[in-house]
């Protein structure tokens, strides 16, 4: 069923115009490694304020349960701990403890969605984006008879890896086979061209664009591994969210 709510037609120069109001997307946000929900809320504050004011999206925040050291760019004292990841990060290939940690995080996030949802979509930054990509792909693979939209009808990735495991030399090995199962839902990708994970964020975008070319959005900026706050970049990101909202509203 469409989320769009048509208002009464109005007329301009004898041409009927249908004014349509789309409700705000309700998104559950997943922070990066060595962060927490309050830090994520702080980093998203400029974007969230604009999106909520314009009734495009509203955010809720999940928090990981694996306590870690502060992540990249997280300065103790400036950002209060404790600091968390959703699972052991980065995960190592063939490591049973890491796989168990991912499985625990998977089950915990499904429980959060069941308890606090429903949500229209999920948003992930860095590690959080990699985890949500794995979550949705695994769920779609393991539950072929269940509509994945009970978890999310869209996804937003900010400077995110695809699902991967590190080899012994600490090189990410992307799980392309798992990524084939990612559902055909609208996605938005925000990618920094100066980011150290730019190559991997681009791969994630390209693979999902192949699955749903008409509903996969891309916003690039010149910054690094951060959630953009520059006003000009924010304008582009907000426009990307508007298109995402439209795609979700008219996806059925």
From Swiss-Prot:
The UniProt keywords, alphabetically, are: Hydrolase
The chain's disulfide connectivity reads none
Gene field: tstM
Q: Which GO terms describe its cellular component?
A: cytoplasm; nucleus
SUPFAM superfamilies to which the protein is assigned, alphabetical: alpha/beta-Hydrolases (SSF53474)
Protein name per the record:
Hydrolase phiM
Pathway terms, separated by semicolons: Secondary metabolite biosynthesis
Mind listing the GO molecular function terms for this protein?
hydrolase activity
* Functional note: Hydrolase; part of the gene cluster that mediates the biosynthesis of the antihypercholesterolemic agents phomoidrides which are dimeric anhydrides. Within the pathway, phiM releases the C12-fatty acyl chain from phiA. The pathway begins with the highly reducing polyketide synthase tstA that catalyzes the formation of a C12-fatty acyl-ACP, starting from one acetate and 5 malonate units. The hydrolase tstM is involved in the release of the C12-fatty acyl chain from phiA.
Active site, per annotation: 126 (charge relay system)
Family according to the record: Belongs to the LovG family.
Give the record's GO biological process terms: secondary metabolic process
């Amino acid at each position: 069923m469409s989320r769009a709510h048509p208002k009464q037609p109005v007329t301009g120069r004898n041409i009927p115009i249908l004014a349509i109001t789309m409700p705000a997307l309700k998104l559950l946000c997943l922070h990066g490694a060595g962060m927490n929900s309050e830090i994520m809320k702080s980093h998203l504050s400029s974007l969230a304020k604009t999106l909520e004011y314009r009734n495009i999206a509203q955010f809720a925040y999940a928090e990981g349960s694996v306590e870690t050291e502060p992540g990249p760019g997280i300065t103790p004292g400036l950002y209060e701990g404790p600091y968390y990841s959703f699972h052991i990060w980065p995960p190592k290939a063939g490591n049973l403890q890491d796989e168990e940690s991912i499985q625990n995080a998977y089950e915990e996030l499904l429980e959060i969605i069941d308890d606090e949802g429903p949500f229209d979509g999920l948003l992930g930054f860095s590690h959080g984006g990699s985890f949500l990509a794995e979550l949705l792909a695994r769920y779609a693979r393991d539950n072929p008879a269940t509509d994945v939209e009970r978890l999310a009808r869209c996804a937003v990735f900010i400077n995110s890896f695809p699902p991967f495991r590190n080899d012994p030399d600490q090189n990410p090995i992307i799980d392309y086979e798992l990524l084939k199962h990612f559902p055909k839902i609208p996605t938005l990708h925000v990618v920094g061209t100066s980011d150290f994970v730019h190559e991997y964020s681009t791969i994630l975008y390209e693979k999902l664009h192949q699955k749903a070319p008409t509903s996969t959005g891309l916003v690039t900026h010149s910054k690094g591994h951060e959630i953009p706050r520059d006003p000009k970049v924010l304008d582009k990101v907000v426009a990307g969210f508007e298109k995402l909202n439209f795609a979700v509203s008219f996806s059925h």
